[in-house]
């Protein structure tokens, strides 16, 4: 649906903090699915943890948040040009839970559902999976603001 080049047209993030490789499904104002391929060459694995690489939970949350940012911006009434002048600020991440570790070689699937969307404010429920197994979940509150 959206490849990495299209995602970069929407999100301001770049390597090493662009944490969504592809958007696979999106229903505007309702839900989004995307993923990140986790490689041993991820910068986080230099220190988390040598000899026992585990993808950091905070980066799982950031990847979910970035997927949510794509949904929020694509669900807004902004033109593509107006969208380039906006950014998503996350106001809170609640009820974050980490269920299973994510390791190099995994494909980390993100699924987010809009609980509430009002012009520039939104509440999203996010879940992350590896091989269909829940790895993390959280509730995100965010807003669209000018850069």
From Swiss-Prot:
What Pfam families does this protein map onto? FabA (PF07977)
First-listed, main subcellular location of the protein, grouped into a coarse class: cytoplasm
Q: List where in the cell it is found.
A: Cytoplasm
Which biological process, per GO, is one annotated for this protein?
Answer: lipid A biosynthetic process
Q: Which InterPro entries does this one have? A: FabA_FabZ, FabZ, HotDog_dom_sf
GO annotation, cellular component aspect: cytoplasm; membrane
Q: What is its EC number?
A: 4.2.1.59
Task: Report the domain of life of the source organism.
Answer: Bacteria
Instruction: Tell whether Ribosomal protein is among the UniProt keywords.
Output: no
Recorded catalytic reaction(s): these are: a (3R)-hydroxyacyl-[ACP] = a (2E)-enoyl-[ACP] + H2O
Q: What class of enzyme is it?
A: lyase
Q: Where is the active site?
A: 48
Example of a GO MF term: (3R)-hydroxyacyl-[acyl-carrier-protein] dehydratase activity
Provide this UniProt record's keywords sorted from A to Z: Cytoplasm, Lipid A biosynthesis, Lipid biosynthesis, Lipid metabolism, Lyase
Q: What does this protein do?
A: Involved in unsaturated fatty acids biosynthesis. Catalyzes the dehydration of short chain beta-hydroxyacyl-ACPs and long chain saturated and unsaturated beta-hydroxyacyl-ACPs.
Q: Which family does it belong to?
A: Belongs to the thioester dehydratase family. FabZ subfamily.
Put simply, this protein is called: 3-hydroxyacyl-[acyl-carrier-protein] dehydratase FabZ
The gene coding this protein: fabZ
């Amino acid at each position: 649906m959206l490849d990495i080049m299209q995602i970069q047209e929407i999100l301001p993030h770049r390597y090493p903090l662009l944490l969504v490789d592809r958007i696979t499904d999106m229903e505007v104002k309702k839900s989004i699915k995307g993923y990140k391929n986790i490689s041993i060459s991820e910068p986080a694995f230099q220190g988390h943890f040598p000899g026992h690489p585990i993808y950091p939970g905070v980066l799982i949350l950031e990847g979910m948040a970035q997927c949510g940012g794509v949904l929020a911006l694509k669900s807004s009434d902004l033109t593509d040009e107006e969208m380039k002048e906006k950014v998503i600020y996350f106001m809170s991440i609640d009820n974050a839970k980490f269920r299973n570790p994510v390791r190099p070689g995994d494909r980390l699937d993100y699924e987010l559902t809009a609980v509430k969307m009002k012009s520039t404010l939104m509440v999203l429920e996010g879940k992350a999976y590896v091989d269909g197994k829940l790895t993390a979940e959280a509730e995100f509150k965010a807003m669209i603001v000018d850069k």
